[in-house]
């Protein structure tokens, strides 16, 4: 399975390029009867990291194929993939935080399954920082405003009685490699990095000061889909969710079975696997469902940014009906 990163200049161009690439993939595949019987489904992930790991587990272990699904995994920024969900060009988006935010202001999308109820982020600092209070008046790098990195940073600073709007300067500068480079070069004083990204930062002499995932419950990783697509392709959605729930069951029960997946798909070194796996299990959702209260951060952020949006109850941003069906069929 090739994982393609999509980075064109505009939203429409990005979605168009996804479709063009997928058509090439389809054309290049063998035309035997087994391949023809599989139903293609497009899974958009925002990054090849732990948040999307259950998708890679299901793909690597052949669970999608066993359920009759040909999973096409593409990498698209979470803030632009919502258009693809609404139009049906993308079947699933793994950034459920973005799905919740879109649904919260009336977009016809829903979260169908959740993987984690917290992040794997760390506050990583320059080596001379020994206490978070030393970051008062300093800078912290996140990916973008309204992202999980943003929510985690603010929650961590509030926990230690620092006002993230006044006491520290939060800078949205982009992806993990950009944040690592900014921290190591001294352009920022700290950065929110996930448990894979922090490893090269530590090797460069930086310090993982604290695990920020412990201070905020929020949706991290899962599958969201368009309402219309879910109705039109209910059987394919059901099969996909069954594969995903089977992957969750395996991840919880057998770390040794998924270790090769982390090494091959997420580029996790063998010596780092146990620590990364343990971080994931701190916030793992084996049932695939999340408490509604844990959706508050993205939901309230979206509502605050769109005060004229129509009323949308928090409970309506998720739809676990198909997941609940498939859970009964997995032993």
Where are these regions (language model features)?
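Sec/Tat signal peptide C-region and signal peptidase I cleavage site
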Residues: 29-35
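Ligand-binding clefts/hinges and TM-proximal coupling segments of bilobed small-molecule sensing domains
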Residues: 148-166, 243-275, 315-318, 327-330
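Short, glycine-/small- and polar/acidic-enriched structural segments
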Residues: 36-185, 189-195, 206-217
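Secondary-structure end/capping motifs
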Residues: 232-310
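N-terminal secretory signal peptides that target proteins for export/translocation
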Residues: 1-12
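Bacterial N-terminal signal peptides
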Residues: 12-29
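Periplasmic-binding protein-like
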Residues: 45, 115-125, 202-233, 237, ...
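Pocket-lining segment of extracytoplasmic ligand-binding domains
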Residues: 98, 177-266
């Amino acid at each position: 399975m090739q994982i393609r990163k999509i980075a064109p200049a505009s939203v429409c161009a990005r979605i168009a390029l996804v479709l063009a690439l997928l058509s090439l993939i389809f054309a290049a595949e063998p035309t035997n009867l087994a391949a023809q019987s599989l139903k293609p489904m497009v899974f958009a992930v925002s990054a090849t990291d732990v948040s999307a790991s259950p998708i890679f587990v299901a793909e690597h272990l052949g669970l999608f194929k066993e359920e009759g699904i040909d999973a096409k995994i593409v990498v698209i920024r979470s803030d632009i993939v919502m258009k693809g969900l609404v139009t049906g060009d993308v079947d699933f988006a793994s950034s459920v935080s973005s799905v919740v935010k879109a649904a919260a202001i009336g977009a016809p999308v829903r979260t169908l399954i959740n993987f984690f109820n917290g992040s794997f982020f760390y506050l990583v600092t320059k080596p001379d920082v020994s206490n978070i209070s030393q970051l008062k008046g300093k800078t912290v790098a996140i990916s973008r405003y309204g992202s999980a990195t943003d929510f985690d940073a603010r929650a961590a600073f509030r926990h230690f009685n620092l006002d993230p709007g006044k006491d520290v300067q939060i800078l949205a500068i982009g992806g993990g490699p950009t944040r690592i480079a900014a921290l190591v070069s001294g352009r920022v004083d700290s950065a929110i990095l996930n448990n894979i990204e922090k490893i090269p930062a530590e090797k460069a002499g930086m310090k993982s000061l604290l695990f920020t995932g412990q201070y905020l419950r929020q949706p991290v990783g899962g599958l969201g889909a368009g309402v219309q697509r879910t109705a039109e392709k209910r059987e394919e959605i059901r099969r996909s969710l069954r594969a995903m729930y089977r992957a969750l069951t395996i991840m919880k029960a057998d770390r040794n079975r998924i270790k090769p997946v982390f090494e091959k798909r997420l580029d996790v070194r063998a010596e780092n696997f146990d620590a990364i796996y343990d971080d994931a299990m701190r916030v793992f959702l084996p049932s695939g469902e999340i408490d509604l209260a844990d959706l508050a951060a993205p939901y309230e952020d979206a509502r605050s940014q769109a005060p004229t949006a129509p009323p949308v109850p928090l409970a309506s941003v998720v739809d676990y009906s198909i997941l609940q069906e498939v859970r009964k069929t997995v032993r």
